Curated annotation (Swiss-Prot):
This is Protein translocase subunit SecA 1. One of its GO terms (cellular component) is plasma membrane. It is an enzyme of class 7 (translocase). The keyword Repeat does not apply. It comes from Bacillus thuringiensis subsp. konkukian (strain 97-27). The gene is secA1.
């Protein structure tokens, strides 16, 4: 009875029922679509586009458009989408997340809403986690879309601007999440409208949406420039930290991963660096370097958090196990690890532009996603992205056997049991996939299997290049594959014909802190109704068990006299593990939510600056905007110099000096004239004189040259001030949590101070632009230039070398071309003399 009631009130079930009716409509259209010739089928695309211009909506077209795609897929790809795939497509079109189990054909499902939404001509982005998948899907599914008369583009990291513009101009663009984010940032750093590559963000479908919007949500995309800093302090701090002893000189909390100096450690530091007080303001940099060196030595572990490769520190993604080349830890932690490992210490970088995936993807008009595991994060998707998770039924029932966890007393006992299980299954010819959380675990199991004479493949960040081949062999008879954190998502493990009746065995060597990652590992077995078995092996020494109170259980095992070879198989323990995972997930969600609240402060500021930049780029004449800036600058200067209530205390001389230095010429404004006026009357004659001088300046050159000069000044000032502001906001953010000790809400303080800093930056921009316009010599330097050369810092480049991406430069001028300064001379005889 309860089960029936649950189904009646189950929102998901109601959605499925509603979509089932639409699927029946699509099925009913099949008889009229099937007889069409290829040409008639292609002609449907033009017919749909015309119907849209006459007032029909994409929702009206859905049943017929889906029926057309289904028929085209059957003809072009030899694959006919099932009813459940049509449901998945409907959920995606409605801006939701389709949870479809591994092997249920998510890629084919995506073609349905992609085609329908591409009919509008506004562009559809299909987002994948790496370039291999983007290329694979663009090549395979692109055939279908091109058959139906739509254009398909692929956007890769290595492409030139022209190639990217072509890719984005297509009806459908396949790309990675990183590349989309970086292109957006770069588009807001260009100096000419023609250099932009993206169109307005219309509709995106994200494959492996949980990986991008949850796991990578806290990873900001950064375009950075070099900041020159001394590397010596890192060396000194590293040498000092090596002399410290745990618990005596520093304390380490395993749960929070916090490490800090004790009183003894502080005294030791003061002696070592010959200073009186480590917490004195003049030693802020030293304290920061010591703290980062401590984190590098105590919290960060080689081959778990990072690897050393070709003399560089490369971060390991804790969720996917992939190497994240090109990405660096911030706040000097990366340099501290470089000092620890004795490799070359690289300069800290300065952020020129930054955005998180959370804020980038929220800019799309409509957003949807697909994954095999999203239900556990449903609240987050709904609250942050306004997307519901719809669990799509499987085409065939799942017959996989998910066994209860086996818990051992020690790691040694656990690994012995894992290897024994692998050996037994290998003898029977059953393919085995072993999931590990860290690279060192996969290498340990590999050594143990080698001793037993079992041939196997390892799939981790170190040999990422062979990933697709290893996954392709993983379902063959007797295959043993060890994978770190399910690297290889997006590639199916297909079973060999001779073992279809046995299925794949999945063995987990540790529970991940996220249930989703465990579910992804389980989901590799039993795809499309195949048999399969999954089993997790745990030990009391696993990190998750250590962090969440396994001491009582360990004591109980000791009391019962259990040895290492006897596991506990208990639902109670499995429930305890699951509740620990829920707690960690809750903590992680709170952290991401908090990050978003902080990032929203910068997002609002970024939108203001980027919108103004866009207006400047598109505007033919900036004079009106600049006059407004001059007016504000003058009013601020007058207010600043006439603050006192008593007239004698006004600093009129200081005001005149300021105006002479920054905006006007000597004698333009006289002290005695201003003394006769009230503060609110002073601005008017000053502004009138400024406009007169502005007019004089305009007469000195052709109008076109003057307009370009204005743009050069505005871009140079805005970009310089904005990058300095981002850096200042970074520093504010780093120290703001300390305000909590004074019973002050850090977020509110960050919002208020961030707003005050933004206001002050705007004032500074207006003042500097006014000064340059009135005081700069115009003959030289008329070409728009980037303030700093920027380079994309990839949060993950899937093990491939991150290519340096300088921010675009203006067009090159030939020596015999007319000089861009407007003099009418050839470049070689003008600004290019001596070049």
């Amino acid at each position: 009875m309860i089960g029936i009631l649950k189904k009646v009130f189950d929102v998901n079930q109601r959605q499925i029922k509603r979509m089932q009716k639409t699927v029946e409509q699509i099925d009913a259209l099949e008889s009229s679509i099937k007889p069409l010739t290829d040409e008639q089928l292609k002609g449907k695309t033009l017919e749909f586009k015309e119907r849209l211009t006459k007032g029909e909506t994409v929702d009206d077209l859905l049943p017929e458009a889906f029926a057309v795609v289904r028929e085209a897929a059957t003809r072009v790809l030899g694959m006919r989408p099932y009813g459940v795939q049509l449901m998945g497509g409907i959920a995606l079109h409605e801006g939701n997340i389709s949870e479809m189990k591994t092997g249920e054909g998510k890629t084919l499902t995506s073609t349905l809403p992609v085609y329908l939404n591409a009919l509008t001509g506004k562009g559809v982005h299909v987002v994948t986690v790496n370039e291999y998948l983007a290329q694979r899907d663009a090549n395979e599914m692109g055939q279908l879309h091109e058959f139906l008369g739509l254009t398909v583009g692929i956007n890769l990291n290595s492409m030139s601007r022209e190639e990217k513009q072509e890719a984005y101009a297509a009806d459908i663009t396949y790309s990675t999440n990183n590349e989309l984010g970086f292109d957006y940032l770069r588009d807001n750093m260009v100096l000419y409208k023609e250099q932009c590559v993206q169109r307005p963000l219309h509709f995106a479908i994200i494959d492996e949406v949980d990986s991008i919007l949850v796991d990578e949500a806290r990873t900001p995309l950064i375009i950075s420039g070099q900041a020159q800093k001394s590397t010596e302090l890192y060396m000194f701090a590293n040498a000092f930290v090596r002399t410290l002893e745990n618990e005596k000189d520093y304390s380490f909390d395993v749960k929070t991963k916090n490490v800090m100096l004790t009183e003894d450690g502080i005294t030791k530091a003061e002696k070592a660096f010959h200073i009186e007080n480590l917490f004195d303001l003049k030693h802020v940099a030293l304290l920061h370097h010591i703290n980062q060196a401590l984190r590098a030595h105590v919290v960060m572990h080689r081959d778990t958090d990072y690897v050393v490769q070709e003399g560089e520190i490369v971060i390991v993604d804790q969720f996917t196990g992939r190497l994240m080349k090109g990405r660096r830890y911030s706040e000097g932690l990366h340099q501290a690890i470089e000092a620890k490992e004795g490799v070359e210490i690289q300069n800290e970088s300065m952020t020129l532009a930054t955005i998180t995936f959370q804020n980038y993807f929220r800019m799309y008009e409509k957003l949807s996603g697909m994954t095999g595991t999203a239900k556990t994060e449903e609240e987050e998707f709904r609250n942050i992205y306004n997307m519901n998770v719809i669990v799509i039924p499987t085409n065939k029932p799942i017959i996989r056997d998910d066994r209860a966890d086996l818990i051992f007393k020690s790691m040694e006992g656990k690994f012995n049991a894992v290897v024994e299980d692998i050996v037994n299954r290998h003898k029977q010819g059953q393919p085995v996939l072993v999931g590990t959380v860290a690279i060192e675990t996969s290498e340990l199991i590999s050594k143990m299997l080698t001793r037993k004479g079992v041939r196997h493949n390892i799939l981790n960040a170190k040999n990422h290049a062979r990933e697709a081949d290893i996954i392709a062999e993983a379902g063959m008879k007797g295959a043993v594959t060890i994978a770190t954190n399910m690297a290889g998502r997006g590639t199916d493990i297909k079973l060999g014909d001779d073992i279809k009746n046995i299925g794949l065995a999945v063995i987990g060597t540790e529970r991940h802190e996220s249930r989703r990652i465990d579910n992804q590992l389980r989901g590799r077995a039993g795809r499309q109704g195949d048999p399969g078995v999954t089993q997790f092996y745990l030990s009391m020494e696993d990190e998750l068990m250590r962090r969440f109170g396994s001491d009582n259980m360990k004591a109980m095992m000791d009391r019962l006299g259990m040895d290492d070879s006897q596991p506990i198989e208990s639902k109670m323990v499995s429930r305890a593990v699951e509740s620990a995972q829920k707690r960690v997930e809750g903590n992680n969600y709170d952290a991401r939510k908090q990050l978003l609240q902080y990032d929203d402060v910068l997002r609002q500021q970024r939108e203001v600056i980027y919108k103004q930049r866009q207006e400047v780029m598109e505007s033919e004449n900036l004079r009106g905007i600049i006059e407004g800036m001059m007016k504000s600058t003058v009013e601020r200067a007058v207010a600043l110099h006439t603050q006192e209530e008593i007239e004698e205390d006004w600093n009129i001389k200081g005001l005149v000096d300021y105006l002479n230095t920054n905006l006007l010429q000597e004698g333009d404004v006289k002290e005695e004239e201003l003394r006769r006026l009230a503060p609110e009357e002073m601005s008017e004659p000053i502004i009138a004189k400024l406009i007169e001088r502005y007019n004089d300046k305009e007469k000195l050159m052709p109008e076109e040259q003057m307009r370009e000069f204005e743009k050069v000044v505005v871009f140079r000032v805005v970009d310089t001030k904005w990058t300095e502001h981002i850096d200042a906001m970074d520093h504010l953010r780093e120290g703001i949590h300390l305000r909590a000790y004074g019973q002050i809400d850090p977020l509110r303080e960050y919002q208020m101070e961030g707003f005050a800093m933004f206001e002050s930056m705007i004032a500074s921009i207006e003042e500097e632009i006014s000064r340059y316009i009135m005081k700069a010599e115009i003959e030289q330097n008329l070409e728009r230039q980037e303030v700093v050369q920027g380079e994309a810092v990839h949060p993950s480049s899937d093990g491939e070398e991150a290519k340096k991406k300088p921010v675009v430069k203006g067009d090159q001028v030939g020596r015999n071309d007319l000089c861009k300064c407007g003099s009418g001379k050839k470049y070689k005889n003008c600004c290019g003399i001596g070049k």
